Amino acid sequence: KQAAYDYLYSDVALKKRLIWLNKLFSDCGLKDYEQLLGLLKENSKLIRRNIEKIILDKEKKTRNLLEQLYPELDEDSQNWTRQLFKYWDNAHASASKIKFRNKQAVIDYCSKHIELYCTQQIAWLPQKPYTRIHWANETDVDEFVPRHVLRYVLSEHMALTQITRLHACDAIVPFVDEKEWQAALEELFRYWLADSAEANRRMLLLPYCFYGAEWQIAQLAPLIKSWSKASRKQLVGLTMKLLGLKASPNALIILNDWMETAPNGMYKRAAWEAFRQAAIRKGLSIEELADQIIPDFGFNRQGEKRVDYGTRTFRVTLMPDFSISVLDLDKQKVSKSLPAPLKSDDREKAENARAEQASLKKRVKTQTNIQKKRLEQSLKNGRTWPKEAWLATFIENPVMRYIATGLIWGVYKEGKLQDSFRYLEDGTFTTADEKEFLLPDNAVISLVHPIDLPDETLADWKEQLDDYELIPFIPQLSAPVHRLTETEKQGDTLLRYSGKKVYLSNIYEFETADITTRIENNTLHIIDRSLNVVAQLSFVYEESDCFLKELYFSSVEEGEDINTIQLPKEERLPLSSIPERFISTLLDILNRAFPLNE
């Protein structure tokens, strides 16, 4: 061990020492932190950065050592140490309870705690945007928030090396006029963007996201897209983490969009993790949170909203095909879009309404595409909703209400279908033989999969949809069915494909939009995060040929993804514990990926 430490302090190149540092204290888990922290005397930013990653969650084991070492450090390392102490202090439960009685208490606190090192991090920002901001609810138009208060808030965020909410700043900001503060943040943000959004100054995104208005959060969406196209991965990743911490409706909608539609797997995973953390903080599952943020675009349950031009009023209706119908309430004239404003109209109201409608079609299309993917996932994994949650998601929301009418739903108990029904536009429910259905108060509801329906009932549902010329939102009733044999249901391993010859290229190209895969040790690992299950399909080479072996399922930990999951999993879940519809869907994917039925 001593030889290892001697090498760490030797004259070898910095790059090799960093590799060795991480090997000893991360990979090998050595805990001689005095040896690690001694490297801080060398005043290397890279060394500090690597040490921070190692000790960030080890305050109890390292803080006393750092306090003793502090007087021996140079200025840069001392500044770094103070910032680390602040991060730890901010994480303590007591920090979240900080409150200020009045604005004088805010002024005194900022005067006491503002630091030169931190203010140096905002020296590049213009001061004018935040020099004439009033206190919240201030009646004296000549009394402004002292500049050092806002400099404190900005500088504390800009000096951070880790992303976190600063409780003291969160307690200060409510004392400041919200609209003026947000306008100042917008001006500072635009100043940074005009300077090519320099990565070294990216921490300005923290106060912008944390304290920005919903319209400011919404305008981050096109920026994230442009940054991703320009391969500015650092900015995209940071912004997604901040949106997860913000967790406002627009922030979560942006993350959900990227979770479902991101072309890049890295960005998709970043959005998913930020969204997952937001869900955890709210005490919800990812899917429950995704349900809650489905936008209604300002429409009521019937898909209607009123638009005011000042002198004229219009009723805008979202139609079942997601087109728009506009009724002039004065003339009783119907059109497909809002008219241009007249001289007698309030021009600002009219132009804002027209601008919103112009983007509505695209936003509705994006949202319906996202919901299509989510419903396809639910059909596959058998996700269920309690009655009240189902009504709130599919009936109260006008977009989802139109979607729900062409789908067949089921009441389930212990995973078994009890009754199937369809929602009608008049608000009632019907059965396959067109009898009225009453939804039980304690109903647990899921999309019906054909594997759960008797052949006669399945045929009745198909006939009913045809008779009413309803086109299902997803191909629900035509989903392929691959049933397990009674013998297979009793075991934990599927051997039906054992010995099947497949092309190696098919294995390495195996991937679907909602399933992530990894190939390791001659095993194809297929991970489904919705069920926290990994399917493991092993194969073997015999000369130039490749043959499948066995397929079995294992559970994965909450939050594990394709990068962090520890494979292989030795545990084998009973096939009877896996939703039959999920196995059926997976077998269909395998049948399409490989010519297994030939």
Residue spans for each PLM region:
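Non-catalytic terminal/accessory regions
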Residues: 1-247, 252, 259-598
